[in-house]
Each structure stands twice: as C-alpha cells, then as structure tokens.
Amino acid sequence: MPELPEVETIRRTLLPLIVGKTIEDVRIFWPNIIRHPRDPEAFAARMIGQTVRGLERRGKFLKFLLDRDALISHLRMEGRYAVASALEPLEPHTHVVFCFTDGSELRYRDVRKFGTMHVYAKEEADRRPPLAELGPEPLSPAFSPAVLAERAVKTKRSVKALLLDQTVVAGFGNIYVDESLFRAGILPGRPAASLSSKEIERLHEEMVATIGEAVMKGGSTVRTYVNTQGEAGAFQHSLFVYGRKGEPCKRCGTPIEKTVVAGRGTHYCPRCQR
C-alpha cells in the first residue's frame, strides 16, 4: 500500500499534468470504488464542468481540488493514476476515467479494486469521512513528542499498533513504522505505554527524519509502486529492516527477523532494538 512518501510523490508528479484542465465527462467502470455520493451517475454529474485547481495530500489520501468540490482518493494496495490521450486505448484494470476538454484523460487503474473515491463540497471535505478521522501530519508542528506521548500512555497496544493508527499520526504504514522503530532502537511489540520520555522523543525524531528522507527519495518501490510518470522510488535502497528477513543488520550484522505484530508482518533487529 502506498504510504505518505509514495502518495506525496504521486501528488507532485501528477499536479502539473492536470492543473487547469476542465472535466468534460467521467466514465466509471467499477462502481464499488465510488463511496460518496454512492450513485455513480450523481458522482460523475457533479464534477462535469469543473476545473482542477490543485492537488493536495492528507495522510495517504489524495485531495483533488476542483472549482466547488474536492475529490478524495485512496489508492489502497494497487491504485495508480496516469494521464493519457483519449486516443490511446485503456489499459487493463482501468476503472475510472476523467475526460478533459483538451482531449487528455486522467485514468485510475486498480488491479485489486480496493481504492475509494469520495466527493464533497470543498469546505466540507476535511470534516467528513475519511479525512475527518485523521491525526496530524508527521511533518507538521501539530505532531510533537508531547502529542505522541499523550497517546502512548493511554493505550494498552504495542508501539507498532499505535503508529499504524491513522488517528494518531496520518500517513504511516508498515514500511515506515518498521523503519522508524529500528532507527529509534525500539522493538515493535513493546507496549507503547512502556516507552520513556527519552524514547518518545527519539522515536518522534526518527519518524520525522524517516518520512522526510523517503519523500526526498520519491518513496519506496518494494512491490509495484511507481509514480505518475512510471518511475520507481529510491528509498528502498535505504531500508534497514523492512523486507530484509534473514539478511545481516546494516549496523550490527545480526540477521533481521520477521514476526507478526498488530496483525502485520514486522521486521526488526533483535540486537539493535529493545
């Protein structure tokens, strides 16, 4: 699943390809992707005639800003966007097509059909699901060691489960939680409430640093992720633990182990993390 760095990279590469373009038609081939309004015809009708004014990101969600409305898109596991000429044939697994007046199209493909789309009036979008439930952005001042500590002391969950909770901090998934915990020297299965104030500060610092570095490197391509221009990310070459089961730790040489924490495959170094 694309996490914050991958979605941010998609946002940056997609924005110049669609900004200023006016929607002439919307074709929907898999209605289950449409979540609000549930009626696909109503979903399409309200966007026709509107111009793309911007593209933002909130956590793992893309937020397309139109004249009056905002389209909220979650890519889930395999969703991706591409811009192509209307004359080019559709690729397999294309489920939604936004046709522009200039003859180009924004095409949404999703092999697994898990993605979702919501349309709301712009002024309502942040107050409605799915955005309303999200916690602070990790690179914003709203996410501080104090905020993290407050949530940690109130839960019986593991620290990994806490960081995967999108109401705590928006945009972290399996890759960047594992990497942040390794860099902070904290075992993923530790109770979040057991972390000391120094560990909380170190974890916060490494979360911010890890996400920031991953954004600069265009995200991680560990399976199928590519940006809007078909380019792979580069942060996978900087991964310390994720996807490296059995390989030597880059810091101490101990083989990286894999277990299950919070229902997710979890990579860690049994020597570097406590």
Curated annotation (Swiss-Prot):
Monomer. InterPro entries: DNA_glyclase/AP_lyase_DNA-bd, DNA_glyclase_Znf_dom_DNA_BS, Formamido-pyr_DNA_Glyclase, FPG_cat, MutM-like_N-ter, Ribosomal_uS13-like_H2TH, Znf_DNA_glyclase/AP_lyase, Znf_FPG/IleRS. One of its GO terms (biological process) is base-excision repair. DNA binds at H93, R112. Pfam families: Fapy_DNA_glyco, H2TH, zf-FPG_IleRS. Binds 1 zinc ion per subunit. SMART domains: Fapy_DNA_glyco (SM00898), H2TH (SM01232). This is Formamidopyrimidine-DNA glycosylase. Gene3D superfamilies: 1.10.8.50, MutM-like, N-terminal (3.20.190.10). A zinc finger (FPG-type) spans 240-274. GO terms for molecular function: 8-oxo-7,8-dihydroguanine DNA N-glycosylase activity; class I DNA-(apurinic or apyrimidinic site) endonuclease activity; damaged DNA binding; zinc ion binding. The keyword ATP-binding does not apply. Belongs to the FPG family. It comes from Geobacillus kaustophilus (strain HTA426). Keywords: DNA damage, DNA repair, DNA-binding, Glycosidase, Hydrolase, Lyase, Metal-binding, Multifunctional enzyme, Zinc, Zinc-finger. The keyword Calcium does not apply. SUPFAM superfamilies: Glucocorticoid receptor-like (DNA-binding domain), N-terminal domain of MutM-like DNA repair proteins, S13-like H2TH domain. Involved in base excision repair of DNA damaged by oxidation or by mutagenic agents. Acts as a DNA glycosylase that recognizes and removes damaged bases. Has a preference for oxidized purines, such as 7,8-dihydro-8-oxoguanine (8-oxoG). Has AP (apurinic/apyrimidinic) lyase activity and introduces nicks in the DNA strand. Cleaves the DNA backbone by beta-delta elimination to generate a single-strand break at the site of the removed base with both 3'- and 5'-phosphates. Its cofactor is Zn(2+). The active site is at P2 (schiff-base intermediate with dna), E3 (proton donor), K60 (proton donor), R264 (proton donor). It catalyses: Hydrolysis of DNA containing ring-opened 7-methylguanine residues, releasing 2,6-diamino-4-hydroxy-5-(N-methyl)formamidopyrimidine; 2'-deoxyribonucleotide-(2'-deoxyribose 5'-phosphate)-2'-deoxyribonucleotide-DNA = a 3'-end 2'-deoxyribonucleotide-(2,3-dehydro-2,3-deoxyribose 5'-phosphate)-DNA + a 5'-end 5'-phospho-2'-deoxyribonucleoside-DNA + H(+). Its EC number is 3.2.2.23, 4.2.99.18.
